[in-house]
Regions:
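Intrinsically disordered, low-complexity regulatory tails and linkers that flank structured modules
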Residues: 20-141
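Sec-dependent bacterial lipoprotein signal peptides
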Residues: 1-18
Length: 141
């Protein structure tokens, strides 16, 4: 009988130690820091930085990523008060967030483009799904 009790005690101890080790792995995975750039979770995106050069236009830049004329027109209407598309400036930086297109895997799909108006202020253009959105924000000083 004593042997039986010892075997049960050992089994319970083994099970509880195994359960504790699984919990610690789950906690470690949950605590993994996210890569946030301009308020966007950059994990899963290819992030590229560019500088506006002479001759660049928003229409041309966005067209090179397959953004349709209709979406550019919607973007133009949304940005009139925030950052008119005509105000693109040579030397200013912009960042693209792209990932592989699920239908055409040879093409990169643009989800976000961030334009730095100056060293502090930036504008995020979002093209996720059929949605076109714009938000203005600033870096912490």
């Amino acid at each position: 009988m004593r042997r039986f009790v010892h075997l049960i005690a050992i089994a319970i101890t083994g099970i509880s130690l195994t359960a504790c080790s699984h919990n610690s792995e789950q906690i470690t995975e949950e605590e993994k820091p996210r890569n946030i750039i301009y308020g966007i979770d950059a994990d899963g995106y290819q992030v590229d930085n560019y500088e506006v050069v002479k001759g660049d236009t928003w229409g041309g830049i966005l067209d090179s990523y397959g953004i349709t004329t209709q979406k550019v027109n919607r973007l133009d209407a949304l940005t009139k008060e925030i950052c008119p598309l005509r105000t693109i400036r040579i030397g200013h930086k912009y960042t693209t967030f792209t990932k592989r297109d699920t239908v055409d895997t040879a093409r990169m799909k643009l989800d976000y483009l961030v334009y730095e108006q100056d060293v502090v202020n930036y504008v995020v253009f979002a093209f996720v799904g059929d949605t076109v959105a714009v938000r203005k924000d600033s870096k912490p000083v």
